[in-house]
A protein has these predicted regions:
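Generic alpha-helical structural context detector
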Residues: 25, 183, 311, 326-330, ...
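Helicase motor core with emphasis on the C-terminal RecA-like subdomain
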Residues: 1-10, 14-18, 22-34, 38-44, ...
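Accessory DNA-binding and partner-docking regions appended to nucleic-acid-acting proteins
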Residues: 1-6, 354-356, 386-621
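Short helix-to-turn junction characteristic of helix-turn-helix DNA-binding domains
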Residues: 27, 220, 271, 366, ...
Length: 621
């Protein structure tokens, strides 16, 4: 069986995604390789397809224990002999997995790094092993955004299997991280398959954070009944924001490491099984999530690096449909990240420099009035637009800047505005906080300003026509660009002009400033974005699509697996557009392989022909 035949038979696709076939062929030829593909780019198929060809055992090392059982279920639905071994596995399931492994009946085995390092597993896999795939490989890198000590010990295990090919896979890796991954895993002359990091189906927006709850609610209301993730920095804010959304009638749950394990498990299961629309969480949530139809991700606080943002926002739109990624920025978030990193003492100089670089880069992404897609692509060392991509001039038409929701000031206006803001901090001697300087520039003569005589300064009311939101945003932008800084003195954050800021006031240097449009002009809901994006050249039947979703939910609940394991939304969209009447016609739908056709074909054809989902569900095996 050829790779193309296996792709059609097991997964129901006639063509590979970019770089998939090349990675599969390298693995089958015994070559070590590094695979960097964006989320939704089909990384898992790069190691699953070699397992489907039946030439030996493929071992997958993954830190995502919460996801393994769902990954095994999905692989089995594709007709693969798959198992998992991890610490959360029940004893009888573990024994059965070992029995099948010893009998040579397993083609694809998922293990956690902790389980692999125990040692007793190695003898069971040595004889048949053809490929070791290390998923989420950025976790091994000293420069990665999620360093995991157990991952850094994998090289010593890999050395015990010199005949097995090695494949390192990740969605998020700068050129420096790519080099480090290859070194840490001792990849031997690796072939590198580096996909373009851009996700054109994602609409990126970054706005100043003013009223966190109201701004989050604005996004949620644009997506009624659709799946979304809201990331918040602290546990307290998770609880507060989740309660606020619930009070507004939103189906949501809180998730953070301080909650009981059972409550966390229930929130995750309800979200993955589409019984829940929204999860409000710290970054503890998401690594074990494989819900492909997440329509939006909101960062209500700024993440600590561009790498974190790329990975977390990348959980949206994995089905290829359009999705919204919104970042609410405040410079105070960066200060908090810095404080948390230093809470246990000073960092080594190398790590301190890396931290400052990461904070500077995510700050620049959030405030620079530059195409967000371009900023992300260039951060990961990729040109933008990608070679062969169709773009209308320089506009991506998929971010707040290119959509005109954030306006860029001219160079002359930006310099003048920056000088006006800087003068407010300079004339007050750096002895007051941001709120005080904002009031000064807006001409709000409160008691403190009057008492200090600052209402008589020439800068008083200098920006009174600009509005508080714009002035606060400009202060944050100038902090990111290093011409203002916030320093702690007696636990009070004071706004000060830097030497670079003083130089700018002397016309030495340049600055870029943007101003967000009013909320009413931003991010209006597009009609049925999911269906439009997944079937741009089709005319899906909306009512039939919903009935097919209902059937999928009934089947998935009976089987105890997430809905995507049965069929992805993209397959349901195509079914609702093409309305196949025969099993052969249904087999032509992308994502309908032989096993799924056999198990679910009759039930889905029944619903397409008009049978109620409740009745048709009993016709699936």
């Amino acid at each position: 069986m050829t790779p193309e035949e296996a792709l059609q038979r097991h997964w129901g696709y006639g063509t590979f995604k970019p770089l998939q076939r090349e990675a599969v062929e390298a693995a089958l030829a015994g070559r070590d390789c590094l695979v960097v593909l964006p989320t939704g780019g089909g990384k898992s198929l790069c190691y699953q397809l070699p397992a489907a060809l039946g030439r030996g055992l493929v071992l997958v090392v993954s830190p995502l224990i919460a996801l393994m059982d769902d990954q095994v279920a999905a692989a089995r639905e594709a007709g693969l002999a798959a198992d998992a071994l991890h610490s959360n596995l029940e004893a009888d399931h573990r024994s059965e997995a070992y029995r099948r492994l010893a009998a040579g009946q397993t083609d694809l085995l998922y293990v956690s790094p902790e389980r692999l390092l125990v040692g007793d597993l190695l003898e069971d896999v040595a004889g048949r092993l053809i490929l070791i795939a290390v998923d989420e490989a950025h976790c091994v890198s000293h420069w990665g955004h999620e360093v995991r000590p157990k991952y850094r010990r994998l090289a010593e295990i890999l050395e015990r299997f010199p005949k097995a090919a090695r494949m390192a896979l990740t969605a998020t890796a700068t050129p420096a991280v790519q080099e480090d991954v290859c070194a840490q895993l001792a990849l031997r002359g690796p072939v590198r398959f580096i996909g373009h990091p851009d996700r054109p189906n994602l609409v990126y927006r970054a706005f100043p954070r003013r009223d966190q709850s109201a701004q989050v609610l604005e996004v949620v209301r644009r997506h009624p009944g659709e799946g979304g993730i809201v990331y918040v920095q602290t546990r307290k804010d998770v609880e507060r924001l989740a309660a606020k959304l619930e009070g507004e009638g939103v189906s949501c749950a809180a998730y953070h490491a301080g909650l009981p394990a059972e409550r966390r498990r229930r929130a995750q299961d309800d979200f993955v099984h589409e019984r829940l629309d929204v999860v409000v969480a710290t970054i503890a949530f998401g690594m074990g999530i494989d819900r492909s139809n997440v329509r939006y991700v909101v960062h209500a606080n700024t993440p600590r690096s561009v790498e974190h943002y790329q990975q977390e926002s990348g959980r949206a739109g994995r089905d290829g449909g359009p999705a919204d990624c919104v970042l609410l920025f405040a410079a105070s978030d960066l200060a908090l990240h810095r404080a948390l990193a230093l809470k246990d003492g000073a960092l080594a100089p190398e790590r301190q420099r890396a931290l400052e670089r990461q904070l500077r880069e995510i700050g620049r992404y959030a405030v620079a009035p530059v195409c967000r897609h371009r900023l992300l692509a260039e951060h990961f060392g990729a040109p933008y637009p990608a070679e062969g991509a169709s773009r209308d001039g320089e506009s991506c038409a998929a971010c707040d800047v290119c959509l005109g929701e954030t306006k860029s000031l001219s160079a002359e206006d930006a310099l003048l505005t920056a000088k006006q803001v800087l003068s407010g901090a300079w004339r007050t001697g750096g002895r007051f906080g941001t709120g005080y300087v904002v009031n000064l520039l807006l001409g709000r003569g409160d008691e403190r300003l009057t008492r200090n005589g600052h209402d008589s300064l020439q800068v008083f009311g200098l920006l009174k026509g600009s509005g508080e939101a714009a002035v606060r945003s400009w202060i944050d932008q100038l902090i990111v660009q290093g011409v203002l800084e916030v320093s702690e003195q007696r636990e009070y954050p004071l706004l000060r002009i830097t030497e670079a800021g003083k130089a700018l006031c002397r016309d030495e240097g340049t600055v870029r400033l943007g101003v967000p449009a009013p909320p009413a002009a931003r991010g209006r809901k597009r009609p049925k974005a999911l269906r439009k994006g997944l079937a741009s050249e089709m005319s899906p039947d909306e009512e039939l699509f919903e009935r097919l979703r209902q059937l999928r939910r009934l089947i998935s609940e009976r089987l105890g697996v997430p809905p995507y394991v049965v069929f992805h939304d993209s397959a349901l969209v195509e079914m609702s557009a093409l309305k196949p009447k025969t099993r052969e016609a249904l087999r032509g739908v992308k994502g309908v392989g032989d096993r799924k056709l056999e198990r679910y074909g009759t039930a889905f054809l029944d619903v397409i022909s008009g049978r109620p989902p409740e009745s048709a569900a009993s016709r699936s095996s």
